[in-house]
Amino acid sequence: MSSRVLTPDVVGIDALVHDHQTVLAKAEGGVVAVFANNAPAFYAVTPARLAELLALEEKLARPGSDVALDEQLYQEPQAAPVAVPMGKFAMYPDWQPDADFIRLAALWGVALREPVTTEELASFIAYWQAEGKVFHHVQWQQKLARSLQIGRASNGGLPKRDVNTVSEPDSQIPPGFRG
């Protein structure tokens, strides 16, 4: 079994038992590694060094700032179901498509393989809120379906790449080229 000794001063357990005050007085940094049967058994620490270590531990346990953040900043509010307004309405932040949106989109000729993501919905809502146009709920859903169809097809059906990722070179040599 390997072990790491955290001090340059090493002493056998017999020497420590025989005269512990002298051993600790000679210890550099106030700490001695005590060995028994050629293996580290424990550390002996002077009272002064122990007080320093406890003060350091207490200092590190305190927060680095006096500012305490409110717990409610970390909790997302639960979305309450919002009734769909009757007639035409402008887009609002809590708008949601119907539960059977994918089926309805198929009826409108838009085949969606996956449900709308929160990012796609947030982008759609933000755009149409800024426009300020008014439509019926079904018309909003049709616009969302069309937006998803165009947005997802723009990249060949693949999700958009993260611009922050580092690309990896392809190590294969195409046919007709020499390596």
From Swiss-Prot:
Record region (Disordered): 156-179
Keywords: DNA replication, DNA-binding, Primosome
Coiled coil: none
An individual GO BP term: DNA replication, synthesis of primer
GO CC annotation terms, alphabetical: primosome complex
Function: Involved in the restart of stalled replication forks, which reloads the replicative helicase on sites other than the origin of replication. Can function in multiple replication restart pathways. Displaces ssDNA from a PriB-ssDNA complex. Probably forms a spiral filament on ssDNA.
Entry's family note: Belongs to the DnaT family.
Record note on quaternary structure: Homooligomerizes. Interacts with PriB. Component of the replication restart primosome. Primosome assembly occurs via a 'hand-off' mechanism. PriA binds to replication forks, subsequently PriB then DnaT bind; DnaT then displaces ssDNA to generate the helicase loading substrate.
UniProt protein name: Replication restart protein DnaT
Organism in which the protein naturally occurs: Shigella dysenteriae serotype 1 (strain Sd197)
Originating gene: dnaT
